[in-house]
């Protein structure tokens, strides 16, 4: 199970940071820089908002979680950290949160709020050249493993949101 988590994390990080900045032609007009900041502290407020929202629904989400921790501290360390983080965030945004609406219909407002905030962080991270990475070869295998878990994977994923937020924060700080 741990190797699946580490592999999943590795894939996420590789994919997550795959964005690169396109070359822009030189112009004589000064254009205001609208790119997001790339410093970890630029994400602190949004991460705190995620934690506050999760804290309100944590008992409900963790009530049915009888699995061991998937997102251990090694997932964002090392050369695969960017791929793992990318895969994890995409997985949460594309699969876990949408499935959570069906598994926990009474928590739709909170889940939508957390998803929206996480989408904002993810979008900014993808646009930050300092957070880019390349190799995406492991992503497919990890995605297939996660898909086999179905609703149990959704429950597990939502119950570990606080751990995801911690790993995201660790990752952002490691890229200074």
From Swiss-Prot:
Report TM segments. Answer: none
Q: Which cysteines are joined by disulfide bonds?
A: 38-128, 82-133
Glycosylation site list = 152
The family database entries (InterPro entries) matched by this protein are listed as: 4_helix_cytokine-like_core, IL-10/19/20/24/26, IL-10_add_hlx, IL-10_CS
Secretion signal, residue range per the UniProt entry = 1-25
Q: Which SUPFAM superfamilies match?
A: 4-helical cytokines
Q: Where in the cell is it found?
A: Secreted
State the PROSITE patterns in the record.
Answer: INTERLEUKIN_10
Q: Which biological process annotations from GO are given for this protein?
A: immune response; symbiont-mediated suppression of host dendritic cell mediated immune response; symbiont-mediated suppression of host innate immune response; symbiont-mediated suppression of host type I interferon-mediated signaling pathway
UniProt xrefs under SMART domains? IL10 (SM00188)
Q: Where primarily located?
A: secreted
Q: Which UniProt keywords apply?
A: Cytokine, Disulfide bond, Evasion of host immunity by viral interleukin-like protein, Glycoprotein, Host-virus interaction, Inhibition of host innate immune response by virus, Inhibition of host interferon signaling pathway by virus, Interferon antiviral system evasion, Modulation of host dendritic cell activity by virus, Secreted, Signal, Viral immunoevasion
Q: Which Pfam families match?
A: IL10 (PF00726)
List the Gene Ontology MF annotations in alphabetical order: cytokine activity
Q: What family is this?
A: Belongs to the IL-10 family.
| General function of this protein | Functional viral IL-10 homolog. Can bind to the human IL-10 receptor and compete with human IL-10 for binding sites. Requires both subunits of the human IL-10 receptor complex to induce signal transduction events and biological activities. IL-10 signaling pathway has several immunosuppressive activities that are exploited by the virus. Inhibits TLR-induced type I interferon production in host plasmacytoid dendritic cells.
Complexes and interactors: Homodimer; disulfide-linked.
Q: Which PANTHER family match?
A: INTERLEUKIN-10, INTERLEUKIN-19-RELATED
Q: Could you tell me what this protein is called? A: Viral interleukin-10 homolog
Organism annotation: Human cytomegalovirus (strain Merlin) (HHV-5)
Q: What is the lineage of its organism?
A: Viruses, Duplodnaviria, Heunggongvirae, Peploviricota, Herviviricetes
- Give the gene that encodes this protein: UL111A
């Amino acid at each position: 199970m741990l190797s699946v988590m580490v592999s999943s994390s590795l894939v996420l990080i590789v994919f997550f940071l795959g964005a690169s900045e396109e070359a822009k032609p030189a112009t004589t007009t000064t254009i205001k820089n609208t790119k997001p900041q790339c410093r970890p502290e630029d994400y602190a407020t949004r991460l705190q908002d995620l934690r506050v929202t999760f804290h309100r629904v944590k008992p409900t989400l963790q009530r049915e979680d009888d699995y061991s921790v998937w997102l251990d501290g090694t997932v964002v360390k090392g050369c695969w950290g960017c791929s793992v983080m990318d895969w994890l965030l995409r997985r949460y945004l594309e699969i876990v949160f949408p499935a959570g609406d069906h598994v926990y219909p009474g928590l739709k407002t909170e889940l939508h709020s957390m998803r929206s905030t996480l989408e904002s962080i993810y979008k900014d991270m993808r646009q930050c050249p300092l957070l880019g990475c390349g190799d995406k070869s492991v992503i497919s295998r990890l995605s297939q493993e996660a898909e086999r878990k179905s609703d149990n994977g959704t429950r597990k994923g939502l119950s570990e949101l606080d751990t995801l937020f911690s790993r995201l924060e660790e990752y952002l700080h490691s890229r200074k």
